[in-house]
Amino acid sequence: MWFFGASVVLTSCKKDDDSDDTIIPPAETPGTVVVTSNITANTTWEAGTIYQLAGRITVTNGVTLTIEPGTIVKGEAGTGANATALLVARGGKLNANGTATAPIIFTSVADELDYADMAAGNFASPNLESTVNGLWGGVIILGKAPISASNDVGDVSEVQIEGIPTSDSNGLYGGNDAADNSGTIRYISIRHGGANIGSGNEINGLTLGGVGNGTIIENVEVVGNQDDGIEWFGGSVNVSN
């Protein structure tokens, strides 16, 4: 285990730098940037600023969100279909490359973790027990890799991911590109999340829908999640820890 003082709850259920990047500069330390709308241009979130998700925030098709090592992201409270989440739509990318000494933390606004804690090497929440859950949604990554799904008509190549209303077409996943690339994720911790919307309809700590094997996912920690830690819906991605 690479985080000290945090217990891990992890279950699963099989069901380049661009010159046009938008750089969000740090506010006064510790500083908070409230993210209220979808990410529609290449964007970098920098360590030293807390990024606060004010709802379901989508990295749209053709766009890359880069998160620097050691960055803190916090989700506002939300329940059911309105649960706060970071959603990477098909064709979007999340490059979140943390390290063992500078992990990227996704947690709740109720978590008092700050950059002073991180600088001291204290990565665990200073105020929330590791069993506290359901305070926000989670991270959802969707791709174009093959899936096994059907509806009333028969077999289909794309479906809506659970936890996202059908009115949001960014929730579609699946396709025929096994090598699809949704980015790189290393050394991230997802904490105190999960949302149960209905029977068989949840937001997990990390949801992977039709994610291709061009995507790299390594060393993911899920702490205190209401539903599954990581849940796969088809796809061909390999995940290692």
What are these regions (language model features)?
Residues 9-12:
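C-terminal motif of bacterial Sec signal peptides marking the signal peptidase cleavage site
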Residues 1-7:
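Sec-dependent N-terminal signal peptides
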Residues 14-241:
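Beta-strand/loop edge motif enriched in small/polar residues
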